[in-house]
From Swiss-Prot:
It holds the Pfam family Adenylsucc_synt. Keywords: Cytoplasm, GTP-binding, Ligase, Magnesium, Metal-binding, Nucleotide-binding, Purine biosynthesis. It comes from Alteromonas mediterranea (strain DSM 17117 / CIP 110805 / LMG 28347 / Deep ecotype). Gene3D superfamilies: Adenylosuccinate Synthetase, subunit A, domain 1, Adenylosuccinate Synthetase, subunit A, domain 2, Adenylosuccinate Synthetase, subunit A, domain 3. The gene is purA. Its cofactor is Mg(2+). Homodimer. This is Adenylosuccinate synthetase. Transmembrane segments: none annotated. Plays an important role in the de novo pathway of purine nucleotide biosynthesis. Catalyzes the first committed step in the biosynthesis of AMP from IMP. It is found in: Cytoplasm. Belongs to the adenylosuccinate synthetase family. GO terms for biological process: 'de novo' AMP biosynthetic process; IMP metabolic process.
Length: 432
C-alpha cells in the first residue's frame, strides 16, 4: 500500500511548505488542502521561476497530480478564479485537475468587510489578520449560517440565504463599526458568475480519497499556516481560525487518521512570525536584521515584514506532541551562514526562577516567562545549494544533531535554498 503523507508547518507559518510539497509530489498522485483559505502563501521556485499559490494545492505544477480542496478550506471564489487564470496563462492545466468539496464554506465580500472593520476597530490590539475574510467565514460556518459551494447550484435558494445572512452582517457593519453596507445584488451576481465553473470541479472528496487509498495511490495533505497558529493549540487569541495541526486532515478532508503513514513537520532553522502575538525568542538587534534580510522574510500573502528570532525547542516539542511528527524538514539552514554563534531556546523561566519545558496555553502567559538559551558555535562556510549532508560544515551538522536531540525527532530533509533541487534528502517520507 502506498504512503499517505501530511506536510505541515510547526511554527507560526512561513516555514517553506510549498517548496517541500512540490519536491515530494514527484511520487504523489493526490495533493489535498484541508484547512485555511487564501491567507496561505506557498512559494515555489522551479528552475529559477517563482510561483506563489494561496489556495490551489502546490501539486498543481506536477502534471500527474490531482489537486483537491477539502471541506475544511474556506473558499473565496474571486481568489480561486484569479489563481486559476494566473496558472492557465502560464500553460498550467487547472480545471481538469482540480477538485473541490461542495461543503467548502464560501468567503464573500461581507466577510472581507467585517475582517477589515474589526482589525481597524482593535487599533493597537489588532491580531494581524490578512484582512481576507478568513475568520468571519469560519465564524459563519460554526454559527451554521454560512453559505457553501453547494449552495451556489440553486440560485433561488442561494439568494434567499444570502439575503438573510447579509442583513445580519450589514447591521453589524453599519450600526456597530460605522462602515458602509455590502451590496446584495453585487454580491449575488458575483457569486452566480462562478457557479457553473465551480460545479464542474465538485466531487465527493471523502469518497474520492477513499477510492484512491484503496487503489494504493499515494496521497499528500498540504497544511497551511503553522502549528503555533492553531485555533485550539496556538498562542490564542493571536491565532488563525482553523486547525492547522494534523487533526485537521480528518475533519477538513474526511480522511480517517489511521490511514496516515507519515507526518513531515516543516521547521525553519530559526523562527519567524508575522503580525502580533507572543514571540519569546524574538531578536530586535543586528542578528535579527541579518535573519530578516538574508532570509527574505516578507510574507508571501501580505508582503509584511516578518519578525525573526532564535530556534525555540520548547515550542517545537509541543508541535511534536500535538502532531505525532515522524520527521522534520529543516529549511533555510543557509540563512545562518556567517553567524559566529547560535542560540537555541531550551526552556522558559518564570518569575520565580523555575525553568519549564512546556509553553503557556494562552498568549498572556508568555508575558510571565523569559527564554533560557543554549549556545552553539556557528559556521562561516557557505551551505547554500548543498545537496549532500557530508558537504555541510561540521558546525552545521552539530546544530542539526542538537535539534534532533532536543525534539526527539530526526531531520529527514534539509533545505538549502528555494529551488526544489537545493535540498538534502536523508530519508524520503515515502521510504520511511
Amino acid at each position: 500500500m502506498a504512503k499517505n503523507v501530511v506536510v505541515l508547518g510547526t511554527q507560526w507559518g512561513d516555514e517553506g511548505k510549498g517548496k517541500v510539497v512540490d519536491l515530494l509530489t514527484d511520487r504523489a498522485k493526490y495533493v489535498v488542502r484541508y484547512q485555511g483559505g487564501h491567507n496561505a502563501g506557498h512559494t515555489l521556485v522551479i528552475d529559477g521561476e517563482k510561483t506563489v499559490l494561496h489556495l490551489i494545492p502546490s501539486g498543481i505544477l506536477r502534471d500527474n497530480v490531482t489537486c483537491i480542496i477539502g471541506n475544511g478550506v474556506v473558499l473565496s471564489p474571486d481568489a480561486l478564479m484569479k489563481e486559476m487564470t494566473m496558472l492557465e496563462e502560464r500553460g498550467v492545466p487547472v480545471r481538469e485537475r482540480l477538485k473541490i468539496s461542495e461543503a467548502c464554506p464560501l468567503i464573500l465580500p461581507y466577510h472581507i468587510a467585517l475582517d477589515v472593520a474589526r482589525e481597524k476597530a482593535r487599533g493597537a490590539k489588532a491580531i494581524g489578520t490578512t484582512g481576507r475574510g478568513i475568520g468571519p467565514a469560519y465564524e459563519d460556518k460554526v454559527a451554521r449560517r454560512g453559505l457553501r459551494v453547494g449552495d451556489l447550484f440553486n440560485a433561488e435558494d442561494f439568494a434567499a440565504k444570502l439575503k438573510e445572512v447579509l442583513d445580519v452582517h450589514n447591521f453589524t457593519l453599519t450600526q456597530y463599526y460605522g462602515e458602509e453596507a455590502v451590496d446584495f445584488e453585487e454580491t449575488l451576481n458575483g457569486a452566480m458568475e462562478v457557479a457553473d465553473i465551480l460545479k464542474a470541479m465538485v466531487v465527493d472528496v471523502t469518497d474520492e480519497l477513499d477510492k484512491a487509498h484503496k487503489a494504493g495511490l499515494p496521497i499528500m495533505f498540504e497544511g497551511a499556516q503553522g502549528t503555533l497558529l492553531d485555533i485550539d493549540h496556538g498562542t490564542y487569541p493571536y491565532v488563525t481560525s482553523s486547525n492547522t495541526t494534523v487533526g485537521g486532515v480528518a475533519t477538513g478532508a474526511g480522511f480517517g487518521p489511521l490511514k496516515l503513514d507519515y507526518v513531515l513537520g516543516i521547521v525553519k532553522a530559526y523562527t519567524t512570525r508575522v503580525g502580533s502575538g507572543p514571540f519569546p525568542t524574538e531578536l530586535d538587534c543586528e542578528v535579527g536584521q541579518h535573519l530578516g534580510v538574508k532570509g527574505h522574510e516578507f510574507g508571501a500573502t501580505t508582503g509584511r515584514k516578518r519578525r525573526t528570532g532564535w530556534f525555540d525547542a520548547v515550542a517545537m516539542k509541543r508541535a511534536v506532541q500535538i502532531n505525532s511528527i515522524t520527521g522534520f524538514c529543516l529549511t533555510k539552514l543557509d540563512v545562518l551562514d556567517g553567524l559566529e554563534s547560535l542560540q537555541i531556546c531550551v526552556g522558559y523561566k518564570d518569575a520565580d526562577g523555575n525553568v519549564k519545558d512546556v509553553p503557556p496555553m494562552a498568549a498572556d502567559g508568555y508575558d510571565k516567562v523569559t527564554p533560557v538559551y543554549e549556545e552553539m558555535p556557528g559556521w562561516t562556510d557557505n551551505t547554500f545549494g548543498v545537496t549532500e549532508f557530508e558537504g555541510l560544515p561540521q558546525a552545521a551538522k552539530n546544530y542539526i544533531k542538537r535539534l534532533e536531540e532536543l525534539t526527539g525527532v530526526p531531520v529527514d530533509i534539509v533545505s538549502t535554498g528555494p529551488d526544489r533541487n537545493e535540498t538534502i534528502v536523508l530519508r524520503s517520507p515515502y521510504d520511511a
